[in-house]
């Protein structure tokens, strides 16, 4: 057993193509949202990306091969670039670099971000991109506006789901022996609205109506969806194992 993973949790996930689909969708959503920010804020497309914090270690469950992960991220950026007609994103050629000490990179990044002149070129802390259709950079959305934003957010989520049936993405994932089948994508879409509604209902407080929403609405259709997909994928994996032993 791995001393850092005594319950073999990582091995359980990586040995299941069904469970790996959830990991891929989660990672892809983060990279897709990064592309949204780069587009709306009109930022220069980075040449290199490294992941910080201990939480980022889960990314290596997908692959520890930097070249393959670089290809996947570049395809995600290119897909979104095509949707919004951003030629810089379309031509993205991202190089992923893993750090042996992600916590150290986090600390160093914090110091760099506070330095001049870089600080002047960063997105302000109080400016949040939500990813809804036809969003204008810098627009504040309040909790009282949640319901009116629902259609735009779900439209955006459906476009995100289209990533996984895009030929270029299918080819990139195939290098890892993985895929996101059509029925998986369709099930995600089915859960999306109820997932959004759960977050909406949790925040439907008149006292909060005038306050700005503090987290990206882009992820609202995904929160409950990933939980439900994890349960379904786990059950599918168990069923497949039973069939193998029959």
How would you name each of these model-derived features?
Residues 1-246:
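Helical "lid/coupling" subdomains associated with nucleotide-phosphate turnover
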């Amino acid at each position: 057993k791995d001393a850092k993973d005594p319950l073999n949790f990582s091995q359980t996930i990586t040995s299941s193509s069904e469970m790996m689909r959830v990991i891929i969708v989660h990672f892809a959503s983060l990279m897709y949202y990064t592309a949204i920010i780069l587009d709306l804020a009109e930022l220069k497309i980075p040449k290199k990306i490294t992941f910080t914090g201990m939480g980022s270690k889960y990314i290596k469950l997908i692959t520890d091969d930097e070249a393959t992960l670089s290809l996947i991220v570049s395809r995600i950026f290119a897909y979104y670039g095509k949707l919004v007609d951003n030629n810089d994103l379309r031509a993205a050629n991202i190089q992923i670099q893993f750090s042996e000490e992600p916590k150290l990179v986090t600390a160093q990044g914090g110091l760099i971000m506070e330095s001049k002149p870089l600080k002047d070129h960063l997105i302000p802390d109080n400016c949040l991109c939500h990813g809804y259709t036809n969003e204008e950079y810098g627009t504040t959305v309040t909790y009282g506006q949640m319901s009116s934003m629902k259609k735009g957010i779900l439209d955006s989520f459906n476009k995100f789901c289209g990533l996984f049936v895009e030929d270029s993405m299918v080819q990139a994932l195939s290098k890892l022996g993985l895929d996101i089948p059509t029925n998986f994508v369709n099930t995600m879409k089915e859960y999306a609205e109820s997932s959004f509604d759960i977050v909406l209902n949790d925040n439907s407080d008149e006292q909060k109506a005038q306050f700005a929403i503090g987290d990206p609405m882009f992820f609202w259709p995904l929160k409950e969806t990933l939980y439900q997909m994890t349960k379904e994928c786990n059950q599918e994996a168990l069923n497949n194992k039973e069939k193998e032993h029959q």
